[in-house]
């Protein structure tokens, strides 16, 4: 099982990635992490009770990696529960690098955005994220 760690100033967020249910989304996320794409980027959108969103190289929600990926919704049983990691997009099949972590269940997002991971440690760190806070770095643990 693959895990990702988001290193924040206050501590680490450990995320279990859903390799089987969202293989292309996970592969893209892992690739970007290994390339250092996310290092130093911010959580540019933080809405208490909803989501903390990051992964925009422009820092305002308008940027991405220069390409898009397809949604992985069919056959993906994962829901937008507390701590879910999901791919942000501006319409179907337009995800790229921006992702969000859900603070509270958001069933209206199920079947719309690809859930590709779940926070397994550090939800207290997620709860403390503020808008504009930098990610110090991300790493992948593969086993």
What positions do the PLM features span?
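Cyclophilin-like peptidyl-prolyl cis-trans isomerases
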Residues: 1-143
